[in-house]
Amino acid sequence: KIYNSAKMTLEEVLEVMFEAEEKGRTTVRLHTGDPSLYGAIREQMDVLEEKKIPFDYCPGVSSFCGAASALNLEYTLPDVSQSVIITRMAGRTPVPEKESIESFAAHRVVFLSTGMLEELSRRLIEGGYQADTPAAIVYKATWEDEKTFVCTVGTLAETARKNQITKTALMIIGDVVSHSHYNRSELYNPAFTTEFREATK
């Protein structure tokens, strides 16, 4: 039997699991993307652990990984970026002040903020980004109707409006989007010794 959890409360979801457990059935609680990111799974696991109902937690492919694939980019380019911040704008679920958009000035992936792009641009610029910083909007990453739009921090909202993107998208911010300048990784450099091979130059 298939249930659409989008129309269910946490209690209703858990009740389905409890009933299945009593009948010796297996329940698959399927999340989009990777459940560890904005998946609201901790509250489910806590109850299952309390009830001593065993479960397996299987990782998925997050849309930020799918978005990188869609844009043919690497988030961690030598001498460009070695860090990625996964964040979101505050909505009904607040964001801790120390994790606000303005407090981070790095390469980042922004979830759940497609309807607030003008504010996102403003706050990124207030936080130290230039308006011409490379950016991208990826709509429905890894889906059949996936769409990608390369723009800048200053044109995020305009790009979304022009292409009628209002939800189900994430934004990638930083020079990794343009991947126009970076140094080669030392990992595969013939002059670099690793645990598995000696340098040859």
What is the meaning of each model-derived region?
Residues 1-58, 157, 169:
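Class I S-adenosyl-L-methionine
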Residues 1-2, 74, 108:
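Short, well-ordered beta-strand core segments
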Residues 7, 32-35, 61-62, 91, ...:
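Short, ordered loop/turn segments at secondary-structure junctions
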Residues 12, 22-27, 83, 92-201:
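A contiguous loop/helix-start segment that scaffolds small-molecule binding in enzyme catalytic cores
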Residues 34-105, 147-150:
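Class I SAM-dependent methyltransferase SAM-binding "motif I" and its flanking Rossmann-like core
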